[in-house]
From Swiss-Prot:
Binding site for ATP: 30-37
PANTHER family attached to this UniProt entry: DNA REPLICATION AND REPAIR PROTEIN RECF
Name the record gives this protein: DNA replication and repair protein RecF
GO molecular function annotation: ATP binding; single-stranded DNA binding
Family: Belongs to the RecF family.
Function: The RecF protein is involved in DNA metabolism; it is required for DNA replication and normal SOS inducibility. RecF binds preferentially to single-stranded, linear DNA. It also seems to bind ATP.
Main location per the UniProt record: cytoplasm
Statement: the UniProt record of this protein carries the keyword Hydrolase: no
GO CC annotations on file: cytoplasm
Entries under InterPro entries matching the protein: DNA-binding_RecF (IPR001238), DNA-binding_RecF_CS (IPR018078), P-loop_NTPase (IPR027417), RecF/RecN/SMC_N (IPR003395), RecF_2 (IPR042174)
């Protein structure tokens, strides 16, 4: 799975760009504010329908332009496909696949599985549970065909239930929602638990390579007491939920906790160690997908050198090379990525939103 070509129009500070990409490493080098992260963000947006630095379309559309347009050619298991995404300032989104309109962003996400490693990505480890749920849900989305529909339906039903909690006085008035919510909640929790169990060995092995000085452990918490029946719990906690005006337990409260030597990682590890752990988690997840489905992720690394010394950069570079996946890396200077440059790599110089191929020695 790789992008062979990327066209960018009116995205962030990039007016227009047409990039022929390497199947291996693609390096984006330039000073801070040059637009190199914008290229990474364009790749991410093409596969997710939204940017990773802003959820508001207006903030990623170039100044005084009506919309941004992204287009890519995808080499997917010896089959080439065309994908396109545009979004207006009003938030209107258009997805095109192989020349036809009317497609969903979820289809792009299936075609372009990506792992994102950014300075903001520490939220996976020290942020709220929603970031770790997203980690599990990425895996479930790519491994369980019914997950996306089930999770979308559950979120819709929970939103309706929460709205109803503000208006009802008896549990019988809300039972109809619970009868639909309960089977979805249990199925989603089972998928998440199965995925966390299945990927545990991959995570442990990769973490042992990156952080051998720690004994790491992982725990999936489904969002309600494991000894309790979810349906009975919803009925029992109705008065509490009504007072809170939201549903306090369920898959939307699940978490995936990580400990080092018995201590939460965010309380023990340094910034550099947390970045290595984040890289290990993303790599393990991508490699697990490849082994299960034969599909390779795209890896996006922003500000690669920050928090990592030379030895750790080299370790990460070697592991990324071993995946044989397509990798996009941003850095301030070519020297920072010297250990990663190889015969399958391509260097791009980015300045003021202009992108040029830079010859390699």
């Amino acid at each position: 799975m790789a992008l062979t070509r990327l066209l960018i129009k009116d995205f962030r500070n990039i007016e227009s760009a047409d990039l022929a990409l390497a199947a291996g490493f693609n390096f984006l080098v330039g000073p801070n504010g040059s637009g190199k992260t914008s290229v990474l963000e364009a790749v991410y947006t093409l596969g997710h329908g939204r940017a990773f630095r802003s959820l508001q379309a207006g903030r990623v559309i170039r100044h005084e332009c009506a919309e941004f347009v992204l287009h890519g050619r995808v080499d997917a298991n010896e089959r080439e496909a065309s994908v396109g995404l545009s979004k207006s300032r009003q938030g209107d989104t258009k997805v095109r696949i192989d020349g036809t309109d009317g497609h969903k962003v979820a289809e792009l996400a299936q075609m372009l599985p990506m792992q994102l490693i950014t300075p903001e990505g520490f939220t996976l480890l020290n942020g709220g549970p929603k970031f770790r749920r997203a980690f599990l849900d990425w895996g479930c989305f790519h491994n369980e065909p019914g997950f996306f529909t089930a999770w979308s339906n559950l979120k819709r039903l929970l939103k309706q239930r929460n709205a109803a909690l503000r208006q009802v006085s008896r549990y019988t008035q809300i039972r109809a929602w619970d009868q639909e919510i309960i089977p979805l909640a249990e199925r989603i929790s089972e998928w998440r638990a199965a995925y966390s169990d299945a990927i545990a060995a991959d995570i442990s092995a990769t973490c042992a390579l990156f952080l051998p000085e720690f004994a790491l452990s992982f725990f999936f918490q489904r969002g309600w007491d494991k000894e309790s029946d979810y349906g009975e719990l919803l009925a029992r906690q109705f008065e509490r939920d009504r007072a809170l005006t939201y549903t306090a337990v369920g898959p939307h409260k699940a978490d995936f906790r990580i400990r080092a030597d018995g201590t939460p990682v965010e309380d023990l590890l340094s910034r550099g160690q947390l970045k290595l752990l984040m890289c290990a988690l993303r790599l393990a997840q991508g490699e697990f997908l490849t082994r299960q489905s034969g599909r390779r992720c795209l890896y996006l690394l922003d500000d690669f050198a920050s928090e990592l010394d030379t030895g750790r950069r080299r370790l990460l570079a070697e592991r990324l090379k071993a995946t044989q996946a397509q990798v996009f890396v941003s850095a301030v200077s070519a020297e920072q990525v010297a250990d990663m440059v190889g015969e399958k790599g391509k260097m791009f110089r980015v300045e003021h939103g202009k992108i040029e191929v830079q010859p390699q020695d």
